[in-house]
């Protein structure tokens, strides 16, 4: 996606977020409609604003939660984000049939999560098992490997290892198709699958603290 289009989308989502917040504040009795709650909760997740997402979830009346299963679905995505469970984020997003008002936000969240995962792997690893990498970015193995080869990474079909390249400074927030790494690191011995995903999770926590 071109950077200009991403910027336009980001502006639109930011504007929609402001509108939803105002609608909640101005709602009779302080109780907004389910569509407003759904969009607002999803937008907070897209902004990675977990504090506001949690506060919103707590103040949504239980009766509205019970009568609108989509709200619980959105929050289940938020729980995966909170747990830094990248594979779980994609699985949970894909498991739900979202409404027309929420679907574009969830698609944007999935894409943003994928770009973030690509960037994190490029920072944290000199080599990673292709299957683990694919799970982390939420793509089939073949598609994930093809994508990184187009970005100048390397892949070994014999060992099924992906060899990332370190990103240029300041490129983490740009579109993946404009993400051009600089240096080529030397490969290191692989570590077991579960340990790799755990290490990535720890690295995410390190970057956020």
Curated annotation (Swiss-Prot):
Principal localization reads cytoplasm
Tissue specificity is: Widely expressed.
Q: Residue ranges of the PCI domain? A: 8-179
Q: Name one Pfam family in it.
A: CSN8_PSD8_EIF3K
Where would you find this protein in the cell? Cytoplasm; Nucleus
User: Which terms are listed as keywords in the entry?
Assistant: Cytoplasm, Nucleus, Phosphoprotein, Signalosome
Q: Which residues carry this modification: Phosphoserine?
A: 175
Q: Which domain of life is it from?
A: Eukaryota
The GO cellular component terms are: COP9 signalosome; cytosol; nucleoplasm; nucleus; perinuclear region of cytoplasm
Q: Give the record's GO biological process terms.
A: COP9 signalosome assembly; negative regulation of cell population proliferation; protein deneddylation
Q: Answer whether the UniProt record assigns the keyword Nucleotide-binding to this protein.
A: no
* Function text: Component of the COP9 signalosome complex (CSN), a complex involved in various cellular and developmental processes. The CSN complex is an essential regulator of the ubiquitin (Ubl) conjugation pathway by mediating the deneddylation of the cullin subunits of SCF-type E3 ligase complexes, leading to decrease the Ubl ligase activity of SCF-type complexes such as SCF, CSA or DDB2. The complex is also involved in phosphorylation of p53/TP53, c-jun/JUN, IkappaBalpha/NFKBIA, ITPK1 and IRF8/ICSBP, possibly via its association with CK2 and PKD kinases.
Quaternary structure and interacting proteins, as annotated: Component of the CSN complex, composed of COPS1/GPS1, COPS2, COPS3, COPS4, COPS5, COPS6, COPS7 (COPS7A or COPS7B), COPS8 and COPS9. In the complex, it probably interacts directly with COPS3, COPS4 and COPS7 (COPS7A or COPS7B).
Tell me its family.
Answer: Belongs to the CSN8 family.
* Name used for this protein in its record: COP9 signalosome complex subunit 8
Q: What is the lineage of its organism?
A: Eukaryota, Metazoa, Chordata, Craniata, Vertebrata
Coding gene? Cops8
